[in-house]
Amino acid sequence: MAGLELLSDQGYRIDGRRAGELRKIQARMGVFAQADGSAYIEQGNTKALAVVYGPHEIRGSRSRALPDRALVNCQYSSATFSTGERKRRPHGDRKSCEMGLQLRQTFEAAILTQLHPRSQIDIYVQVLQADGGTYAACVNAATLAVMDAGIPMRDFVCACSAGFVDGTALADLSHVEEAAGGPQLALALLPASGQIALLEMDSRLHEDHLEQVLEAAAQAARGVHTLLDLVVRQHVQEASVSLGD
């Protein structure tokens, strides 16, 4: 990425956004009737689909059941056509396992698991197209799917990435910005309380700049919350209308 100007002198990024500006977000809930909950989201050109099953009885060994809360199971996969590599990823490869673990940690912090002891909640997320901010898109899609399933949560959990270029914090990184290799992080936030569900850093960032980049990600995550809240309200309204017919 040598010689590629990620931020112009006028403060514009390669795709025309300002430093703290989100990519366009579009989302729908209830896209799979067979699942207990489902959602589809587009964040820029990154597209993700999430389906949720549960709470239901523990599958497999009952010894896995937790006496005081639900077991949260998250699985991540990416379509073979999701990136320009066209590389077949075996199910359960390292990246998929790491992403599944990050998603589980995120949603264990957000779901009121104590309301459903000795049960299991399954969250499956697939990335259909990857163009930066993959983890964030997965979290935001899964949040809508969990809500669609009617599973109680402490709050929305909203995620966004951020990076640092030429002394400026950039929110919601595209693939080109991620590939440039600068410092970047991903943040999952419970916006009402400000609680951090997950914070993941991909490279070193000087402590003098950490607060600035973290605030850019948090501000962007709050912007995501505003948009997801509208999606939920619209979905509830549409469901109420269809029930009334």
UniProtKB/Swiss-Prot annotation:
Subunit structure: Component of the RNA exosome core complex (Exo-9), composed of EXOSC1, EXOSC2, EXOSC3, EXOSC4, EXOSC5, EXOSC6, EXOSC7, EXOSC8 and EXOSC9; within the complex interacts with EXOSC2, EXOSC7 and EXOSC9. The catalytically inactive RNA exosome core complex (Exo-9) associates with the catalytic subunit EXOSC10/RRP6. Exo-9 may associate with DIS3 to form the nucleolar exosome complex, or DIS3L to form the cytoplasmic exosome complex.
Residues spanning the membrane: none
One Pfam family named in its UniProt record: RNase_PH_C
Purpose of the protein: Non-catalytic component of the RNA exosome complex which has 3'->5' exoribonuclease activity and participates in a multitude of cellular RNA processing and degradation events. In the nucleus, the RNA exosome complex is involved in proper maturation of stable RNA species such as rRNA, snRNA and snoRNA, in the elimination of RNA processing by-products and non-coding 'pervasive' transcripts, such as antisense RNA species and promoter-upstream transcripts (PROMPTs), and of mRNAs with processing defects, thereby limiting or excluding their export to the cytoplasm.
Compartments it resides in: Cytoplasm; Nucleus, Nucleolus; Nucleus; Nucleus, Nucleoplasm
Molecular function (Gene Ontology), one example: mRNA 3'-UTR AU-rich region binding
UniProt-recorded name of the protein: Exosome complex component RRP41
Record's GO cellular component terms: cytoplasmic exosome (RNase complex); cytosol; euchromatin; exosome (RNase complex); nuclear exosome (RNase complex); nucleolar exosome (RNase complex); nucleolus; nucleoplasm
InterPro entries tied to this protein: ExoRNase_PH_dom1, ExoRNase_PH_dom2, ExoRNase_PH_dom2_sf, PNPase/RNase_PH_dom_sf, Ribosomal_Su5_D2-typ_SF, RNase_PH
GO BP field: defense response to virus; DNA deamination; histone mRNA catabolic process; maturation of 5.8S rRNA; nuclear mRNA surveillance; positive regulation of cell growth; RNA catabolic process; RNA processing
Provenance organism: Mus musculus (Mouse)
Keywords: Acetylation, Cytoplasm, Exosome, Nucleus, RNA-binding, rRNA processing
Family recorded in the similarity comment: Belongs to the RNase PH family.
Residues with N-acetylalanine modification: 2
CDD domains found in the cross-reference section: RNase_PH_RRP41 (cd11370)
Primary localization class, coarse: cytoplasm
